[in-house]
């Protein structure tokens, strides 16, 4: 015989998988061409020199060098560049 009353059901208990977004290579770090620098939703960071942008807004190095983050422009946008060593 059951010693506990039947529990009701719930409509909660779900969550989406983490997408592992964010900065992958920080300022001053050396990168090779093709290295992912930032994974993002939208353009939180914009592509500077020697940096390309994928269709999902991922920023990647197009040349070997060191990563440089800078804020510039009238709208104070954050740019990511790769400076050749």
Curated annotation (Swiss-Prot):
PROSITE patterns, A to Z: RIBOSOMAL_L27 (PS00831)
Stretches for region Disordered: 1-20
Gene3D superfamilies: 2.40.50.100
A GO CC annotation given for this chain: cytosolic large ribosomal subunit
A GO biological process held by the record: translation
UniProt xrefs under Pfam families: Ribosomal_L27
InterPro entries linked: Ribosomal_bL27, Ribosomal_bL27_CS
Keyword vocabulary terms for this entry: Ribonucleoprotein, Ribosomal protein
Keyword hit for Ribosomal protein: yes
Keyword Ribonucleoprotein included in the entry's annotation: yes
One annotated GO molecular function: structural constituent of ribosome
SUPFAM superfamilies: Ribosomal L27 protein-like (SSF110324)
Family: Belongs to the bacterial ribosomal protein bL27 family.
HAMAP family documented for this protein: Ribosomal_bL27
NCBIfam families noted in UniProt: L27
Designated name of the protein: Large ribosomal subunit protein bL27
Gene source species: Histophilus somni (strain 2336)
């Amino acid at each position: 015989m059951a010693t506990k009353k039947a529990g009701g059901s719930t409509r909660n208990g779900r969550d989406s998988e983490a997408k592992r977004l964010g900065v992958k290579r920080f300022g001053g770090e050396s990168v090779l061409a093709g290295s992912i620098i930032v994974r993002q939703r939208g353009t939180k960071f914009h592509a500077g020199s020697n940096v390309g942008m994928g269709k999902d807004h991922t920023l990647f190095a197009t040349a070997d060098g060191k990563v440089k983050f800078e804020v510039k422009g009238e709208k104070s946008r954050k740019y990511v560049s790769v400076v050749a060593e």
